[in-house]
């Protein structure tokens, strides 16, 4: 399973586009979980993510009262079920093959870590 972790805080302007690009991924949804770790947003970020979590069971929202990225990643990793961890940024959108290309590269190269350049 691929566990995608996305730390978020006050992302209401960007989060829907980010999630829509996640939903457009060609990666199998039955082998995917997406965990948004929210730093207690004060805008509509949580409401927007909640609309998606209600429709898509592989998307979750957890809290990060510490409000900074390192604890958000740690909380996301602890909550994850996958054997592969991927980090995303909420300000970005992702090509529909982004997940599958990175996972394939990880296995093909026998690498411990792979990354990509994204346009934000």
Language-model regions, residue ranges each:
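N-proximal low-complexity "stem/linker" segments adjacent to membrane-targeting elements
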Residues: 1-21
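Conserved donor NDP-sugar-binding/catalytic core segment of glycosyltransferases
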Residues: 97-120
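Short aromatic/hydrophobic "clamp" motif used to bind/position activated sugar donors
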Residues: 85
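A conserved acidic beta->alpha catalytic loop
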Residues: 38-47, 92
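Short beta-strand/loop segment that forms part of the nucleotide-sugar
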Residues: 31-40, 60-65
């Amino acid at each position: 399973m691929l566990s995608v972790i996305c730390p978020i805080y006050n992302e209401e302007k960007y989060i829907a586009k980010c999630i829509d690009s996640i939903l457009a991924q060609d990666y199998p949804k039955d082998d995917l979980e997406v965990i948004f770790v929210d730093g207690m947003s004060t805008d509509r970020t949580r409401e927007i993510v909640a609309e998606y979590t209600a429709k898509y069971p592989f998307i979750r929202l957890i809290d990060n009262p510490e409000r900074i990225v390192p604890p958000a990643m740690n909380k996301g990793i602890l909550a994850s079920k996958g054997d592969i961890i991927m980090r995303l940024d909420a300000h970005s959108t992702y090509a529909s093959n982004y997940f599958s290309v990175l996972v394939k590269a990880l296995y093909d190269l026998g690498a411990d870590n792979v990354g990509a350049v994204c346009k934000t």
